[in-house]
Each structure stands twice: as structure tokens, then as C-alpha cells.
Amino acid sequence: MALHPQAGRPHRDGSEAQAEAAAQDLGRLPSPSKVGAAVCRIQGLGHRAARRPRRGIGTTSASRVPRPGALMPATRNRPRFIHCRGQPPRTRVSSKRSKRSRIHPCHTEVPGWTHEKQMGSSVKERLRPELSQLDQDADDLEEEEAARLPVTSPDGLLMEGDKQPSPGQGPFFYIGGTNGASIISNYCESKGWQRTQDSHCEDYKLKWCEIKCRDNYCSFREGQQLLFQLPNNKLLTTKIGLLSALREHARTLSKARMLPSTQTKVLKMEEFFPETYRLDIRDERQAFFALFDETQMWICKPTASNQGKGIFLIRSQEEAAALQAKTQSIEDDPIYRKMPFRAPQARVVQRYVQNPLLLDGKKFDVRSYMLIACAMPYMVFFGHGYARLTLSLYNPHSSDLSGHLTNQFMQKKSPLYTLLKESTVWTMEHLNRYINDKFRKTKGLPRDWVFTTFTKRMQQIMSHCFLAVKSKLECKLGYFDLIGCDFLIDENFKVWLLEMNANPALHTNCEVLKAVIPGVVIETLDLALETCQKSLHSQKMLPLLSQRRFVLLYNGETTDLWPRLASSRPLNRLPNPNPNPNPNANPHPHPHPNPHPHPNPHPNANPHPPRPTCEAASSALSSARAAISERPGARKSMPSRGAPVCTPRKSRLSDSSGSSIAESEPSLCSGSLEGSRDTAREPSLGPPEEEREEEQRSTSHRGS
């Protein structure tokens, strides 16, 4: 039997004669309020086929009552809910539009209804128009209600399953955690952005998380989004990571100083970093316990912790022997050797600075900031912070850690903190006035020592640390990071770097912090936005309109041959307003940004020379790599993790003359560090084996 000519278009079949005939055969309509087994009596198919589940039809409920006059299949027993295995194909469930859930199945043939027989069933011809009419009525009702409802979802959030926001929504931002959340939220909302609570949202403009998550970096859209914290910033922000980076950098610089053409004075690690040993390495552990004596005090710290957690002092042979026995027993335990994730966190022991400079008899340190505003090219800044004081007077023989550690987490444990918390934080201006009054004449210090010598020394140390890890950091356009750096001043006014912290504390629980922290956060976001946009559109970085209090430490635009983005995705670059048809019009374009532009002598010359392309960078790198390979015993460079595929960066290689290997540290007498060139060119050798093991054990942490 041939199929009905209208069967291929069920939604357009309106034959009343067929509908009346089908209604007589199907019988009465089932009551949706009753519960029972719905059995369709179809001639020629048998009871087994009639009992088959109706996949693709969905479930029936009391809230979905058939329209009057709609045709339904006859049932012998009471109707019941039909159990469907899995979700029907191409089924869309409407949500948040009314209390009635409507299911729109695709018009496919389902078992037990219309295709039990492959060809020529008279039942099929009668049932198709009625089922099609039900679908058409539901679609009409759906469109009518949708036309009366607003398009946007509540609170401006993405509805479940949507990948892109509806017109008029977004951009979105996400904040994970409470550290500085109010400041960041107010900043983003002032720009018209909408906050989302969905941590898995991929359509965001800014994501600021306290704890790093691998998924954030896997779904990151380079050049389109901003993401707080570099993926492997632990090279700077963990004790072992910073120690290993400084040691490797020192070895590289010592080899460079052996060359006759490199006589530049560089900063030595022992000049600013206290003597430190790793307890997770047997040789270093034995060396420490061999040199320990009770005349010196040491401090033991976990490698990836902050807020003073897990820190204790070592002052006697008994304490040193107990620590040695504990570490040795753990290392020899076969259970912990087979279960690395249960092994205790790696630790370092650091020589305690026993003669710190005191403010009114209290120990203090200085929190400053290193901002990596852009990673392609690197734009690194220094920012002033504040001084942190202890509540109690300094006593080197005291066992109370609150007198040795200055962070707010430790000071809050004191019962006097609520009354005296304002005295635990000083502004840099307050510190400068105090040192001018108390120590300028007695110590022979220059005027405003805090803002001259001390500030330049902090900038020099930060630059040294950044250059030690620059070739290993994972960089993508849109990554940015704010790192808290803690400095200590001893009574001889020597500056020591204690540690660097990821996700620095941004709380504002006292007046000084209320005056300092918001400015740091706002300028951080401003610089991250501006540098990202300028890099994306191939514009000169300098001058930066959003730069106010931060000082530029490193400008990768003038020192690195850096590629734009991966060649797999082109960028939307700004058109050149002044094309240069004559290739000889400007034969010597200067690639360095000039904050004081001069008139262009050639009207057709391009005032903004193009940046080095991937091909030009590859050519320069090939010649440099060939020169290196000719030297006896030269090591071949390894590709950097996270670097784009198109070309490696020249900053990881040294030229044939060797002049670029010498590190150019900012001088203490220099007036500005802007545009300081990075001439340290060492191959990226990757982290050592013990550092890779520590990477698996280290975990993210909250602000300190």
C-alpha cells in the first residue's frame, strides 16, 4: 500500500475526513489525571508492539492537558507516565518561561507508533496527521508565549546551555574567592560588565581567582580575555621555586662574567637573599645540619605556604636534632616513599636576620608589588605598598612567633589587635619621615632614603628575580599577575628579600590599607587592559595613559623579539593610517618606543614601524643559534613551555659575541628604570628534577 501523498509533510495535513475517521478508531481521550498503563490497540501490530515504550514522545503530566478537540490514541487501561531511556534526539525543553514545561521532539519515527511496519500501514496514514497537529499546536503556543516574554535572563546571567550571551548582555567577569572581591567587582561594574557566579563560564572578559585551576588555562582565549595569575608563577612565589631560579641564574651569570667582553657589575644572590637550604634534598640537608651551631638562629618554612603557617624557629642543637630525625625518618619510611602525595610538604631553612631595623622597638618589613601587566611582550612594573609592624616589642629570644612575623594573619591572634591594629601598618610616607627623623644624621643617610636608595634597591632585586625566571614563565596575551614582595631592612640598612607571594592580601581592615590597596588593584587592572589592547593592535606600549604610581621595570617591547600570537589564529590589527609605498622612504626605522616623538622627515614614511615578524625573528634566531653551537661545550636551547609555536624568543639565547649574556641590572644611582634592557640570554633548561617533583606536591593557597 502506498503512503499518503501528504505524509511527508505532516504539519501541513489538515484533512478533516481523515481526522474524523481516526477519532472514531482511536476512541475516547485518556484522562491525564489518572495513572495507569497506556496501551494502544493497533490492528495488525499485536499486543507486544502496543506495549513498546514511546521514545521521543516524552512524559505526560497533569500540567500538560491536551487541548480540546485534540486527537489522542485510545487506551484500554489507565494512562501512566512513560519511562524514556535517555534524552530524545533534538529535544528542547523550555525553561523559565512558564510553569508548564513543553517538550518539542523532532519529527522522527518512534517505535510503537508509526514505523512498526516499514511500508504501507493504514494505521500510519491515520496517526500521522493527528500527531502532526499536536506538534503544530504546541509550536504555535510556544511562539505566542515567547513573543510576550523578555529576551534577557534574570540577573544578566547566561542560561544553562548557552555558549554566547544574548544581545545586550555582558561582558562578564568572574571573581573566585573574597580577597579584594569588592574592589574588583566595583571596578568591573563601573565599566558596564556583569558578574557571573558560574566558575565554568568561558565567555568572560576578566577572571580573577585566588586558587589556580587547570581548566581556566585550557579554555583561555588568548588576546580576548584577561586571566589573573600566570600558570607557573610558583617559580617566583614558592620558596623552593625562587631559590632554584636564583641559583640557576647565578650560575649563568658566573659563566658570563668569565667572558672578557662582560665586565658589567651584576647583583649577587648572597647580597640580598639570606642563606637558604632545602630539606628535601639529602646533600643540602646534611650540609645544613653540619654547619648548624647555636650562635645562629634559623627559620624553617614550608615551600608553598603563607600567612605564617608551618613556620618555626631553630635555635638549639636539640631542635636541630629533632628536625633532622624527623626528616630522616620520613625519608626512610617505605610507605611515604611509595605514596608521594601523602609525603609532607618540602621545607627550606633560612638564616634568620637577627639584627633587624626596629621602629619604636618593633620589628617590621615592607610589602611591595611586582606587576606583570602583560606577558606578550613582558611589561613589568614596581609598586609601593606599606610597612607592616608587630604589636609586641622585638625580643630575639622569644618563642612567640607574633614578635618575629609581621603579617596581619599572625598579628590578629593577639588580644590587643582590635585596639592597636591601626599602629601595625604604616604608609611609605610615614616610614620615610620616621627614618629621616631618627636615622638620617646618625647613620649618614641621604634625605628621603626610603624613596631613593631603598626604592631603587627593591626595584633592582625585583628585576633580578624576574630575569631569573623570564625564559621559563608561560606567557600568553591576556595573562597578568600581581606578586607581593616582602623586604626586610637590617640595622645596617641592608635590604633583604624574604619571599614573594602569589595572590597577595588585598583586604582593607585599617585606614592605611584602605588608602593603599584600592589604588594598587585599580591601576593593576587598568595597566592590564591597556597593555593587552595595545599589544593586540600592534601599538606602541609607551606612553601608558593608565600608569600613575607604578614604575616600569622591564619593557619587553624594546628588548625581546617576541611573536604576536600563534599563527593558527589571525589577529584583527588596526589599519595603517599612513601607508608607505616607497620602501626606501624610511631605510632605518627605529624599533624602540620614543616618548618624545619628532617630526617625520618623510611624509610617506610610516611613523609606526612594524614589529619584527615571526619570519624575521626566526632568521635572527637561526644565526644566533648557529653561533652558539660553534662554541665548544655549548648547550642547545630547549623550547620553552607555553611559548608560541611560530618562533622561540631571542631572549633565551646569547649572541655570538657574548655581549648579550651579561646582565644589565639597574644601577642604584640611576634615576629611572624604565626601559631597562634585559641582556641576560640563557637557554631555557627547564626546571630540575627535584623542582618537577615539588611541582606535583605544591598546592595553591590564599593571600598573605
From Swiss-Prot:
EC category name: ligase
Gene Ontology CC terms, in alphabetical order: axoneme; cilium; microtubule; microtubule cytoskeleton
Tissue expression from the record: Highly expressed in testis. Expressed in brain, heart, kidney, liver, lung, muscle and trachea.
Residue sites binding Mg(2+) 2 per the record: 499, 501
Result of changing residue 499 to V: Loss of NAP1 polyglycylase activity
Compositional bias ranges of the Basic residues kind: 93-105
TTL domain boundaries: 169-540
Site note Essential for specifying elongation versus initiation step of the polyglycylase activity, residues: 307
Feature: compositional bias, Low complexity: 616-629, 654-667
Sites where the protein binds Mg(2+) 1: 486, 499
EC identifiers of the protein: 6.3.2.-
Function: Polyglycylase which modifies both tubulin and non-tubulin proteins, generating polyglycine side chains of variable lengths on the gamma-carboxyl groups of specific glutamate residues of target proteins. Involved in the elongation step rather than the initiation step of the polyglycylation reaction. Polyglycylates alpha-tubulin and beta-tubulin. Polyglycylates non-tubulin proteins such as nucleosome assembly protein NAP1.
The protein's name: Protein polyglycylase TTLL10
Gene name for this UniProt entry: Ttll10
